[in-house]
Curated annotation (Swiss-Prot):
It is a multi-pass membrane protein. Keywords: Cell membrane, Membrane, Transmembrane, Transmembrane helix. The keyword Membrane applies. It comes from the Bacteria. It is found in: Cell membrane. GO terms for cellular component: plasma membrane. The chain crosses the membrane at residues 9-29, 72-92, 111-131. This is Uncharacterized protein YxeG.
Amino acid sequence: MRNQKAERLVAAGLVLHIIQWIFILWAFLKVKHLFSDYTIYNPNVISGSMQSLSFIQMMRAMMYSGAIVNYVLFFALVLLIYGIVLHAILIVLEMAAYVMIRRNPSSSWGFFFIAAGVKLAILNITGIPFLAAGFLLMKQKKAENGVKAERKRKPRLRIRRQGRRLNRIRRKPSLPVEYQKEKTI
């Protein structure tokens, strides 16, 4: 039994999350472009600015420059990088969960959608579809489990086994055969 509403909500959440990731990547590239040729403000040098050869060297120079402006920019860039990597990992996991839910709607990937929805809903609005889809899947799972629980409560018909009697007959007699024949007559 597939849940079409949950699948649509997950697809909408994926699209929103990918759009958000592209926006964060665009913001990072815009901020990075502000530092043309990786030039930063450094009050410790005569010209007042310092040029680096790579992005990593620029980040290192920001940390060691001693200027508060560079510290703020450094942490802003680190947060943007962290956001890009984290959201990329979440998008991949959400795609995997979407595929797994389409295969088996009662799988435990519904819990992932609830967790991702809570995490993203705290940060921004992209988590709302995941949260709703996770709750729909949990409701469906509880409904399916409830039906199974009612079936288990029905009394089971007992079938008496005749194994004891058969085993008694098959046993090796402890008395001699002549005595048993006399007794049965």
